Every structure is written in C-alpha cells, then in structure tokens.
Amino acid sequence: MSWIVYVLRCRDGSLYTGMTNDLDRRLTAHRAGKGGAYTRSRLPVRLVYTERRRGRGAALSREAAIKRLSRAAKLTLVTRGR
C-alpha cells in the first residue's frame, strides 16, 4: 500500500507536515477542523506538497525528516517539488 507524505500551508503561513494512506479523507478532516489540534486553530489550510512512499515505515521516516528541516529548507522543498 502506498502512503503519502504531505505539507499544508496554514492561514498564518506556517507549514504542517503529515502522512496518510488516504489523502482526500485526511484533507477533508483537516479542513473540517478534525485533522489535528495544530491545523484546527490555523484554518484554512492549503495542500502545497505531496510525496508518495511505498510503505508506512518509509512514510514515517520521510515525515520525520521533513519535520526536522528548517523553515527555509521546507519552503525550498515545496517550491522545487511542484
């Protein structure tokens, strides 16, 4: 099963990184204020980056790696990834 690592841009300009095996369902949850406490208080959110991984473990590792990046590096990833 493939997993998706994604980055959202929140209303305040912050970036949220997550992972899911059903991107449409997860985005719907985020936009409804049920996706997580961080995004709930920063609606609306916009999807700005996605990356597919083959397994859950690979997605978890990539999500963690992106979360460790500086904001500048995340913005570069988002800009070059599209």
What are the residue ranges of the model-derived segments?
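GIY-YIG nuclease catalytic motif and its immediate N-terminal context
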Residues: 1-82
